[in-house]
Design a protein with these regions (language model features):
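Short beta-strand/loop element within the Bergerat-fold HATPase_c
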Residues: 99-111
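Conserved glycine-rich
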Residues: 165-166
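Conserved catalytic submotifs in the C-terminal HATPase_c
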Residues: 35-40, 57, 62-72
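Short helix-loop "hinge" at the ATP-lid/N-box region of the Bergerat-fold HATPase_c
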Residues: 92-93
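Short conserved segment of the HATPase_c
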Residues: 124-138
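Conserved micro-motifs of the catalytic ATP-binding
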Residues: 29-34, 73-76
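Short alpha-helical segment of the dimerization/phosphotransfer core of two-component systems
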Residues: 9-14
């Protein structure tokens, strides 16, 4: 039974790698089209938080959704932005500390909305920040075996946001936590 469980986990991991590689290859081709529309980012983030509630609870991590914006409507490809939020929240939980928090926050910045995903997890060393969004790059290769993932999530986030003419930013301190942030245009 133990062998079957390991095999099943390996198959799931391979499926995730293939799916992530497919996403990356589509993002890098001219075939990639954004379906830009106005949508409620707060509702979308609530759905993402709900999807991770059980995983966060199992790891004793509290999820918080904080809206400090006067509006909730942004312009973007809703499905792609959902993938961005899923990847960032998932990483925040995976690299979080027992009893820690993951916060998804929204701020008004003139014609844009600033979206932040912050945690009080293990943090990232400054010398790793430049390579963080490269395919398959893992900050702590020894620890990442236990954590799982494909090493493609942040590369996907970067490509999606670049296709929205936006950037992903990161601030991090080892043993203090990380904050990933990006802008989306507000809907009029």
């Amino acid at each position: 039974l133990k062998y079957l469980e390991r095999t099943n986990k390996s198959v799931d991991r391979m499926i995730n790698i293939v799916e992530d590689l497919e996403v990356i290859s589509r993002l890098e081709t001219d075939e990639y089209q954004l379906d830009l529309q106005a949508f409620n980012i707060f509702e979308l983030a609530s759905e993402v938080i709900d999807a991770f509630e059980m995983k966060a609870s199992q790891m004793n991590i509290t999820l918080e959704l904080i809206n400090e914006s006067q509006t909730e409507l942004v312009i973007g490809d809703k499905d792609k932005i959902q993938q961005v939020l899923m990847n960032l929240v998932s990483n925040s939980i995976k690299y979080g500390k027992d009893g820690g928090k993951t916060r998804v926050r929204f701020f008004d910045m003139e014609a844009n909305m600033l979206i932040e995903i912050a945690d009080d997890g293990i943090g990232i060393a400054e010398d790793s920040l430049d390579r963080l969004f490269e395919r398959f790059y893992r900050v702590d290769k020894n620890r990442s075996r236990d954590i799982g993932g494909t090493g493609l999530g942040l590369a996907i986030v970067k490509h999606i946001l670049e296709n929205h003419n936006q950037n992903i930013n990161v601030r991090s301190t080892v043993s203090v936590g990380s904050t990933f942030s990006f802008f989306l245009n507000k809907a009029d």
